[in-house]
Amino acid sequence: MSNVTIYATDWCPYCRSLLKGLDGQEYDLIDVDQDEEAGEWVKSVNDGNRIVPTVRYSDGTHATNPLAAEVIAKIEALA
């Protein structure tokens, strides 16, 4: 398991952009359209809204629709 889990969908342009920017980085990817429990977690941290991409870090923090550079910086900080 990596230090980063990305909650996304395959139809979301923001998700595709983030994943493209993270090319070469290690992360776990969960499709919230396929995993109802994951979708509920996303809603729980986004005021009841299923906003993707949402990123969960191994230190317990999370970010909604972050820039790839922000995720990479956090990956490096957690390494």
UniProtKB/Swiss-Prot annotation:
Belongs to the glutaredoxin family. Involved in defense against toxic arsenate. Involved in the mycothiol/myoredoxin redox pathway which uses a mycothioltransferase mechanism; functions as a monothiol mixed disulfide reductase and is recycled by a second mycothiol forming mycothione which in turn is reduced in a NADPH-dependent manner. GO terms for molecular function: oxidoreductase activity. Its main location: cytoplasm. Changing residue 12 to A: Abolishes activity. Disulfide bonds: none annotated. It is an enzyme of class 1 (oxidoreductase). One of its GO terms (biological process) is response to arsenic-containing substance. CDD domains: NrdH (cd02976). Its EC number is 1.20.4.3. This is Mycoredoxin 1. Residues 1-79 form the Glutaredoxin domain. It catalyses: [mycoredoxin]-L-cysteine + arseno-mycothiol + H(+) = [mycoredoxin]-S-mycothiol-L-cysteine + arsenite. The keyword Iron-sulfur does not apply. InterPro entries: GlrX_actino (IPR011915), Glutaredoxin (IPR002109), Thioredoxin-like_sf (IPR036249). It holds the Pfam family Glutaredoxin. It is found in: Cytoplasm. Keywords: Arsenical resistance, Cytoplasm, Oxidoreductase. One of its GO terms (cellular component) is cytoplasm.
